[in-house]
Structures are given as structure tokens and as C-alpha cells.
Amino acid sequence: MAVYTDINEVDLKDFLAHYDTGELLSFKGIAEGVENSNFLLHTTKGALILTLYEKRVEKDDLPFFLGLMHHLSAKGLNCPLPLPRKDGALLGELSGRPAALISFLEGMWLRKPETQHCRAVGEALATMHLAAEGFALRRDNALDLAGWQALWPKARARADEVSPGLKAEIDAELVHLAGQWPKDLPAGVIHADLFPDNVFFLGDQLSGLIDFYFACNDFLAYDLSICLNAWCFEKDGSYNITKGKAMIDGYLAVRSLSPAEVAAMPVLCRGSALRFLLTRLYDWLTTPEGAMVVKKEPLEYLRKLRFHQAVETAAEYGWPQ
């Protein structure tokens, strides 16, 4: 979550008049994240999240995102719900941006995830994949291989400012992935951004998943590779195979993977590492000064990519033999 667009109290109260939210007591911007402008509201009827959609989020995609949250919630997955306006619409407009009110989900994200949390995330991810079956809408992944190839030229010229030799390294990796990327794996709706700050816990119990604004249709195993990258590396850059095994075991307890999915894990992990390297690099080079947003260091994902380049089989991630 982040703030790119400021709002004022007068406009906010006019916006809230279209909802049955009670009286506004306070609001403040939320700095975490990189995609939309988010605010925590307190009203006489409770806490809410206000999201203004901008940057990579296309207005035409919003029915998919908001509808998916409704679908998953109806299937029993704990996730935020978009609140309808008095006219039944899920979207309004504030400060020139499409905007929605989202229910507040209890819990906090973990700054130091441990092994048991990784297992819980694996279980929750597989549960989400199964719960999303039957969702009627479709959204192609804008950040798939073709998306990386399109984004890279926007950062390529200045890449070596961030790390000498980075331009040539990413050039070579894109060539490799173009030749090795799987063509036919089990697919469905994926979260595509299930980082620790998008998973809430109450104590050691997972209380819900948030931030579905990268959700799309793609390989289900690719979503697991994103989570292995996001949850199973230590601060020193080393891969924690105990955490990886716990996450994989948690996932497999809910949904089994085909032999083709297992065999593809090393290249999928390379791809997901490159995806976040590229978007972080682009944001690092282009985020406006003064934006209330936490820019994320791109080279963390270069180190992860280099690890995956040396992996030969899924067993090195903790896959059961």
C-alpha cells in the first residue's frame, strides 16, 4: 500500500456520503506498497480501507479484482470485501481517481516469518487456487514473460547505474527464459503478489490474504514460485530450505502438483525472481521524489535470481523425494 494522490477531508466526506459508513472520525495515508494510494479510515461504524487506483492498475481490470474478492469470500477464504455504494456500485471517484472502500481485515503482517508461517502460507495459497475455480471473469497476466520483455527497455538504459553489468545479465536471462518457459501447465487464478505484507496473522494463526491487484490467470505453480522467493530467503540472501519445505508441504496438503509442474519449478523461480527484479528496478528509477511510498531495493532479487540459476531440480527447494 502507498500514497501517490493526496485527499482532503471535504472531498472525502462527499465521497463517503454515497456509502453507509457512518460519520468520518479520522483518516491517514498508508505508506507501505507501491501500486495504489491507500488510506486507513476510522468511522462511527468501524475501520475501513480507502483505495485510489492508479499507476499500473487499469480501470477496466477493477471488476475482475473486486469480483474476485467477493468470489473468494463466498468460498470461505478470509479476504477483504469491497463495500457497495448506496446505488449498488463498487466503484466511485475521488481526487480524479477510481476509488473503492474495502473492509478492514484484522491482523498484522509478519516482519520475521518462521517455518510454521511458511507452511500456513502454502496451505492458504493452494486453498485460494481451489477457491478461485469457477470464477467467471478472466484477466491475462500483464507481467508475464511478454510483459517483462516490454518493461525491460524502460529501465535498461540506466540499469548499470544500479549495478555494473546488470544490463547484460538481464539481457541474457530474458533470452534464456524465452527459450525455456513452460507452455502447458495447470492454470487458473493466481494472487501473483503474496508477499509477507499481503498476509495477515493474528498470533501464529493466518487471518487472511489481502491486495489482489496483481491477481490474474496464469500457471498455478508460478504463484508458488513467487511465494518461495518472497518467504524462504534469509536477510543474508541464503535460501532456507526448511522454510521452503514447509511451504511446499503446506501447499501439497491442499493441492497436488503434476510432474510437469515440479520439473518446471527452477525455471518458474527464475522467472518470478526476474519479474520482481524488473519491476523494482523500474520503480527505483522512476518513482517521483516526495511520493509517500517505500521503494524496494531491486538487487535483493538479483541475488535470488543468481541462486535459482544454479538450481537443477525442485528437490533443492525442499520438494519431497
Curated annotation (Swiss-Prot):
Reactions performed catalytically: L-homoserine + ATP = O-phospho-L-homoserine + ADP + H(+)
Enzyme class: transferase
Annotated InterPro entries: Aminoglycoside_PTrfase, Homoserine_kinase_II, Kinase-like_dom_sf, Pseudomonas-type_ThrB
Pfam families: APH
Protein origin, superkingdom: Bacteria
Molecular function per GO: ATP binding; homoserine kinase activity
Keywords, sorted A to Z: Amino-acid biosynthesis, ATP-binding, Kinase, Nucleotide-binding, Threonine biosynthesis, Transferase
Entry EC no(s): 2.7.1.39
Keyword Nucleotide-binding set for record: yes
SUPFAM superfamilies: Protein kinase-like (PK-like)
GO biological process: one example: threonine biosynthetic process
Pathway note: Amino-acid biosynthesis; L-threonine biosynthesis; L-threonine from L-aspartate: step 4/5
PANTHER family (UniProt xref): AMINOGLYCOSIDE PHOSPHOTRANSFERASE DOMAIN-CONTAINING PROTEIN (PTHR21064:SF6), AMINOGLYCOSIDE PHOSPHOTRANSFERASE DOMAIN-CONTAINING PROTEIN-RELATED (PTHR21064)
Family: Belongs to the pseudomonas-type ThrB family.
UniProt cross-references to HAMAP family, sorted A to Z: Homoser_kinase_2
Protein's recorded name: Homoserine kinase
Gene: thrB
